[in-house]
A protein has these predicted regions:
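Single conserved hydrophobic/aromatic residue that forms the stacking wall/gate
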Residues: 1-9
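Alpha-helix-loop-beta-strand connector modules within alpha/beta enzyme cores
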Residues: 7, 37-49
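Hydrophobic faces of well-ordered beta-strands that scaffold small-molecule active sites
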Residues: 13-17, 55, 59-63, 80-84
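Active-site-proximal loop/turn and secondary-structure-junction residues that shape catalytic pockets
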Residues: 19-23, 65, 88
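Alpha-helix N-cap and loop-to-helix initiation/capping positions
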Residues: 27-38
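Short helix-capping segments at alpha-helix termini
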Residues: 48-54, 104-106
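Catalytic cores of alpha/beta
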Residues: 65-78
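C-terminal helical cap(s) of enzyme catalytic domains, especially alpha/beta-barrels
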Residues: 88-107
Length: 107
């Protein structure tokens, strides 16, 4: 679906991946290795379509991101950021998640 994107729009596009079984209150978080693997496929597919220009398109992971898995997801080489939901409902928890990710020194 992204084949028709022009060079100008590539810089305005973000890709967010969330496994269907990780969505919602009863969602089950994906193992970190699974999320990294899927993001690697996303990154390689974008490179096949757009070459090196694809490296400017951020690929975010969402899907039951929480305080327990956020930093492990955040440091993965093909995950450019996190697309969070419920954890952001509580400002203190969200601030804690951000602080924990920033403390990794990554990204």
């Amino acid at each position: 679906q992204s084949r028709g994107l022009g060079d100008v729009y590539k810089r305005q596009v973000w890709i967010a991946y969330e496994p269907v079984w990780a969505i919602g209150v009863n969602g089950i978080p994906a193992p970190v290795e699974y999320a990294q693997e899927k993001h690697h496929v996303i990154r390689e597919t974008l490179r096949e379509l757009y070459g090196e220009a694809a490296d400017v398109v951020p690929a975010l992971y969402g899907g039951s991101v929480n305080l327990e898995n956020a930093t492990r997801l955040f440091v993965q080489p093909d995950i450019d950021g996190l697309y969070v939901g419920r954890v952001a409902w509580d400002a203190k928890r969200f601030a804690g998640l951000i602080a924990d990710c920033l403390a990794t020194g990554e990204k």
